[in-house]
Amino acid sequence: MFLMNILCLVIPILLAMAFLTLVERKILGYMQLRKGPNIVGPYGLLQPIADAIKLFIKEPLRPLTSSKLMFTLAPTLAFTLALSLWIPMPMPHSLINLNLGVLFILALSSLAVYSILWSGWASNSKYALIGALRAVAQTISYEVTLAIILLSVMMMNGSFTLSTLTTTQEHMWLILPLWPLAMMWFISTLAETNRAPFDLTEGESELVSGFNVEYAAGPFALFFMAEYTNIIMMNALTATLFLGAFHNPLFPELFTVNFITKTLILTAIFLWVRASYPRFRYDQLMHLLWKSFLPLTLALCMLHVSIPALSAGVPPHM
């Protein structure tokens, strides 16, 4: 039965991830005044399936001087972690209702750094290594603000369990009282998932393709799948934290529809940003975090910690 639950979680995520690649190519196509994929199947709907078949039947080549174990392990770890992050997500019921769901998500997203570092180092290529070092520095840096923003939200929520956020947001979405944090959170999720305008890890003009430059076929597909699964996961988390859907226990389907709609809108904004903005310079990327976001989030976190103490009260549902 538990295996069935896992399959019911994993299969829709994989389908969503596959069609997100198609939606992205279509949106970018229309924003650049062209059609996008439209050959395979009606309106190009079977393109993701064709891509998957093509990638997984190709021979997985690797550089002669690369470390075989790490080279294979890195994409597998990246994809496994991307799927594991969904375990505590309330949709409306999570796979395992963890008491410290937020901490679990933070810990696993930090582990994703290892897969990037291993892939860059094991490839034995200077481009891959520089791309990996950039990606690691960027991911670790932006995780600092994500953690502080999460702490502020949890102060409003009163617990580290994600499912209680629906109760907290019954009367008002947290995006309204916490809008500066919500804006910084959204920009940080763009940087965390290595998306434009923060896609410095794959600067084509200087690094060819970043840390996965030596990968081909199946392992490359795993990295690609991990990236898009992470994008959907981050947007689902944003929807849960700041745009909580109303949960009526008699009609749990309404929660799911509401939740998916918000996640889709946020994902569309990700794609819109990618089509609209040029890439940041590396020093600008780091200045934005360490000189703008970090002082602001720390100040706002102190404010949210002091509010319950000053009002001698506790957060809503405790």
Swiss-Prot record:
Q: What is its main location?
A: mitochondrion
Alphabetically ordered keywords of this record: Electron transport, Membrane, Mitochondrion, Mitochondrion inner membrane, NAD, Respiratory chain, Translocase, Transmembrane, Transmembrane helix, Transport, Ubiquinone
Its domain of life reads Eukaryota
Describe its membrane topology: Multi-pass membrane protein
Tell me which GO cellular component terms the UniProt record holds.
Answer: mitochondrial inner membrane
Gene Ontology process terms (BP): mitochondrial electron transport, NADH to ubiquinone; mitochondrial respiratory chain complex I assembly
Q: Which InterPro entries does this chain map to? A: NADH_UbQ_OxRdtase_su1/FPO, NADH_UbQ_OxRdtase_su1_CS
Q: Where in the cell is it found?
A: Mitochondrion inner membrane
Under Enzyme Commission nomenclature, its number is 7.1.1.2
> Which reaction does this enzyme catalyse, per its entry?
a ubiquinone + NADH + 5 H(+)(in) = a ubiquinol + NAD(+) + 4 H(+)(out)
**Residues that span the membrane, as ranges:** 2-22, 37-57, 69-89, 100-120, 136-156, 171-191, 231-251, 253-273, 293-313
Has UniProt tagged this entry with the keyword Membrane? yes
Q: Does the keyword Glycosyltransferase apply?
A: no
Report a single Gene Ontology molecular function. NADH dehydrogenase (ubiquinone) activity
Q: What's this protein's function?
A: Core subunit of the mitochondrial membrane respiratory chain NADH dehydrogenase (Complex I) which catalyzes electron transfer from NADH through the respiratory chain, using ubiquinone as an electron acceptor. Essential for the catalytic activity and assembly of complex I.
Please give the family membership noted in the entry: Belongs to the complex I subunit 1 family.
Subunit structure as annotated in this protein's UniProt entry: Core subunit of respiratory chain NADH dehydrogenase (Complex I) which is composed of 45 different subunits.
Q: What is this protein called?
A: NADH-ubiquinone oxidoreductase chain 1
